[in-house]
Amino acid sequence: MIQQQTLLKVADNSGAKEIMCIRVLGGSKRKFGNIGDVIVASVKSATPGGVVKKGEVVKAVIVRSVRGLRRADGSYIKFDENAAVIIKDDKQPRGTRIFGPVARELRDNEFNKILSLAPEVL
């Protein structure tokens, strides 16, 4: 469950290390986001020479959540950390590599490029 002010790790090589959620997209009163949701975030820490810089406002998709997600078969999937991948406006990732596992539910929201770059899809 991601809301405003939540800190997330960045699971790609775009240059950002940590981002803070500013807004969960998808409705005017939307408070919480989960795996597969797009958020607007601010870069809180970044590596030197990266594509994105500290203080930049970016869009990102949530790929891992501590709260987890209930699947249609009744099972749950949970992760140890909250993580996101920085994306462009056309839902393509800004980085060229994805680190760590991602949830299969990203396929429903047409993030197929992220799924193909990920080392493991759960």
From Swiss-Prot:
Write down the InterPro entries for this protein, in alphabetical order. Ribosomal_uL14, Ribosomal_uL14_bac-type, Ribosomal_uL14_CS, Ribosomal_uL14_sf
Per the record, its GO cellular-component terms are: cytosolic large ribosomal subunit
What GO biological process terms are annotated to this protein in UniProt? Answer: translation
Question: Is Ribonucleoprotein among this UniProt entry's keywords?
Answer: yes
> What CDD domains does the annotation carry?
Ribosomal_uL14
Named from the GO MF annotations, one term is: structural constituent of ribosome
Q: Which residues form a coiled coil?
A: none
- What is one Pfam family matched by this protein? Ribosomal_L14
Keywords in alphabetical order, please.
Answer: Ribonucleoprotein, Ribosomal protein, RNA-binding, rRNA-binding
Role: Binds to 23S rRNA. Forms part of two intersubunit bridges in the 70S ribosome.
Assembly behavior: Part of the 50S ribosomal subunit. Forms a cluster with proteins L3 and L19. In the 70S ribosome, L14 and L19 interact and together make contacts with the 16S rRNA in bridges B5 and B8.
The Swiss-Prot or TrEMBL record describes its family as follows: Belongs to the universal ribosomal protein uL14 family.
Instruction: State what protein this is by name.
Output: Large ribosomal subunit protein uL14
Source species: Clostridium perfringens (strain 13 / Type A)
Source species taxonomy: Bacteria, Bacillati, Bacillota, Clostridia, Eubacteriales
- What gene is behind this protein? rplN
